[in-house]
């Protein structure tokens, strides 16, 4: 059953990320009024003149309450894989979500849309997945109408990870960290955005696992990106201990501007699969495209 939704403001965190950029474009095209919660509006690019702006920080409850006034829906995309000194992953992903949730409850927001991840549990070995699981538990316990999306790996043609892989393909060989055998069901950011838009017409209190139509390993995704760039390269697997040592050293040298961290590399050893395949996306009227076709 679908219900008509009075058109009020949709507040978005993480609007400058891979999903956020695709979602901004999709919502604007659909004529939805959008408010982006940002620290630096310049990172929105041309979208900054097409949306409302609210300066806020997940560490500031007062600023969050001010930013959410007049909004009926919050879409919470902001998250981090690496520490953001002085804040750690757990504070940004876990406590930050709870602060935003409480602000939404106090300012009259009706619906809270949260992005978790396939495979997020308290018992995962990575801090990112554990923090996402704890945040999801908090969202589930809220009195608001909630919608939870748990996607597999989300990509876009020019997202940071695809860009790094494309640059690595300039080398004579394509380096892949670890075994490269972890499996994913990659889904295009634009398809994810279409799922979110469709879900806004529902009653809420739903959870969707979003996946693309293919099961691909990390190595296979790397090959697809290289091939789409016109560069078919032989694969070289870099042992994880060497990857870890190298990335830790780079972070010490370059600080938080380093292009990748061990936490990010470690995630590419953890499968993100759902037995539901594309069923949840299909239920929202979206037929996800294969990765090779998008690239």
Residue ranges of predicted features:
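Mid/C-terminal beta-alpha module of Rossmann-like enzyme folds, strongest
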Residues: 2-4, 199-262, 271-295
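N-terminal Rossmann NAD(P)H-binding glycine-rich loop of SDR-like oxidoreductase domains
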Residues: 4-32
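SDR active-site strand-loop-helix element
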Residues: 13, 37, 74-78, 112-118, ...
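NAD(P)H-binding glycine-rich loop region in Rossmannoid oxidoreductase-like domains
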Residues: 42-99, 103-106, 118-122
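Conserved catalytic-site region of short-chain dehydrogenase/reductase
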Residues: 83, 118-130, 154-159
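Short alpha-helix in the Rossmann-fold core of NAD(P)-dependent oxidoreductases
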Residues: 90-94, 113, 132
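Substrate-positioning beta->alpha
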Residues: 99, 160-161, 178-200, 206-209
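Conserved beta-loop-beta element that borders a ligand/cofactor-binding pocket
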Residues: 116, 137-160, 167-170
